[in-house]
Amino acid sequence: MSVIPMVVEQTARGERSYDIYSRLLKERVIFLGGEVEDRMANLIVAQLLFLESEDPEKDINIYINSPGGSVTAGMAIYDTMQFVKPDIRTLCVGQACSMGAFLLAGGTAGKRIALPSARVMIHQPLGGFRGQASDIQIHAQEILKIKQTLNERLAFHTGQTIERIERDTDRDNFMSAEEAKAYGLVDEVLASR
């Protein structure tokens, strides 16, 4: 069972309590924690759109601690990050693996950060399918298209060549925060504000 901390604030009208995530959202902080899946993606997309409507000029901060997850859910978040007007500052706390690393790299250039002990991992998309041979072939072609799209966007965000991205994502490729910076997945490694 998960317990979400509450924050109590004094206002002119008395006390007001928020769950910690709602309070941080007031400060334009979104937490992307855990597996990337459809429900999480819908919540994060909604938060991005809400924060854009509140102030389209002020940065949005996404703190990432994720082992990765669904490519389609991740792409919904990624596309919205690119779509909204505010700059998106991404910050890796803990880990940003697979789709988490892709979203970390998808932040606004110059505003992608990792904390010193963060771990980042990139790899090719995973998939599995059972069924008739012709259906398996259709799904295999689709995952290859997705792989190409992800590689092209990673190359764009990191400045690496598509050939290097293809090589480096062939298997799980783990990096320290400093290695992720050298690779172009993040712009800074920060120990303190």
Curated annotation (Swiss-Prot):
Which InterPro entries has this protein been placed in?
A: ClpP, ClpP/crotonase-like_dom_sf, ClpP/TepA, ClpP_His_AS, ClpP_Ser_AS
Q: What is its main location?
A: cytoplasm
Signal peptide coordinates? none
| Pfam families xrefs | CLP_protease
Query: Reaction catalysed?
Result: Hydrolysis of proteins to small peptides in the presence of ATP and magnesium. alpha-casein is the usual test substrate. In the absence of ATP, only oligopeptides shorter than five residues are hydrolyzed (such as succinyl-Leu-Tyr-|-NHMec, and Leu-Tyr-Leu-|-Tyr-Trp, in which cleavage of the -Tyr-|-Leu- and -Tyr-|-Trp bonds also occurs)
Taxonomic superkingdom: Bacteria
Which GO terms of the molecular function aspect are on file?
A: ATP-dependent peptidase activity; ATPase binding; serine-type endopeptidase activity
Keyword ATP-binding found:
no
* Matching PANTHER family: ATP-DEPENDENT CLP PROTEASE PROTEOLYTIC SUBUNIT (PTHR10381:SF70)
The record describes the protein's role as: Cleaves peptides in various proteins in a process that requires ATP hydrolysis. Has a chymotrypsin-like activity. Plays a major role in the degradation of misfolded proteins.
Q: What is this protein called?
A: ATP-dependent Clp protease proteolytic subunit
